UniProtKB/Swiss-Prot annotation:
Organism: Homo sapiens
Stored PROSITE patterns: SMALL_CYTOKINES_CC (PS00472)
InterPro entries, A to Z: Chemokine_b/g/d (IPR039809), Chemokine_CC_CS (IPR000827), Chemokine_IL8-like_dom (IPR001811), Interleukin_8-like_sf (IPR036048)
Anything else known: This protein can bind heparin.
Family membership noted in the UniProt record: Belongs to the intercrine beta (chemokine CC) family.
The name this protein goes by in its record: C-C motif chemokine 13
GO molecular function, a single term: signaling receptor binding
């Protein structure tokens, strides 16, 4: 009886710490740097430091502006002001790496 209890404990511990137990289906594996809503207000250009463009793994294309205070703000890349700000902040496109 004691042997079977020990074996059961070992089996449960092995299952709990198995990396496959932590795996998630790809459908649920959404990168944390995706935008699901866009800022409804135009941001002051003077507050911005940089930007990145979300990856193709995100459900919608977006621009993430980073402020000088470290805040991240999602914006719609189709908006004219967003395109102008991207040009002003740098000609090189900044894309997030997956």
């Amino acid at each position: 009886m004691k042997v079977s209890a020990v074996l059961l404990c070992l089996l449960l511990m092995t299952a709990a710490f198995n990396p496959q137990g932590l795996a998630q289906p790809d459908a649920l594996n959404v990168p944390s740097t995706c935008c699901f809503t866009f800022s409804s207000k135009k941001i002051s250009l003077q507050r911005l430091k940089s930007y990145v463009i979300t990856t193709s793994r995100c459900p919608q294309k977006a621009v993430i502006f980073r402020t000088k205070l470290g805040k991240e703000i999602c914006a719609d890349p189709k908006e004219k002001w967003v395109q102008n700000y991207m040009k002003h902040l740098g000609r090189k496109a900044h894309t997030l790496k997956t």
